[in-house]
């Protein structure tokens, strides 16, 4: 397998404020978290883990041959949970890069994960995240995040508001991150910041501390399941692709 120095970690908590037991919701006959894991597994990476506080989630992943790392339910963010899981990976001294994939993207494309890894290894950036070019109509939902970048693709700011103001085309932020190990360790050591808490976007902690984030373009906006409405959208999407 390629990229033996990379760990892909999928954080998944059973409790969710907006959608009860979100990881266990069915899309077709398969749970959300199993779908995410199976999509990520298509990248064919040696070190792929689901990290969770739930025996039920663990049972689902182990049943399909996946590896699980248990982490405490009180960990505040997905990135914190990712780091705690990384510390528990056997022989983690051989892991130089960590990719954090949200556990609510049932149709995430494996090619996006591989693109992050390639860019992380071959660019000047220690943190990389994917973006998609979209029109205004596609990003107007409140949960969507846009990013402004410079001419080299370096992130300047992330916001839940549409940025830059007045534009006709935007960069939609896909909430997946690739970290060099040292960058993840540094991120975890920094306290939450004003802009992070204001926008409710933990990546702003990075920018506020003068750490660069590189962006790489990918082709499609993945469905993220946070609400019942999102779940129904995902179910409909699955039904449509199943007919093909």
UniProtKB/Swiss-Prot annotation:
GO terms for molecular function: 3-deoxy-manno-octulosonate cytidylyltransferase activity. It is an enzyme of class 2 (transferase). Its EC number is 2.7.7.38. GO terms for cellular component: cytosol. It comes from the Bacteria. InterPro entries: Cytidylyl_trans, KdsB, Nucleotide-diphossugar_trans. It catalyses: 3-deoxy-alpha-D-manno-oct-2-ulosonate + CTP = CMP-3-deoxy-beta-D-manno-octulosonate + diphosphate. Keywords: Cytoplasm, Lipopolysaccharide biosynthesis, Nucleotidyltransferase, Transferase. The keyword Heme does not apply. NCBIfam families: kdsB, PRK05450.1-1, PRK05450.1-5. Belongs to the KdsB family. PANTHER family: 3-DEOXY-MANNO-OCTULOSONATE CYTIDYLYLTRANSFERASE, 3-DEOXY-MANNO-OCTULOSONATE CYTIDYLYLTRANSFERASE, MITOCHONDRIAL. HAMAP family: KdsB. This is 3-deoxy-manno-octulosonate cytidylyltransferase.
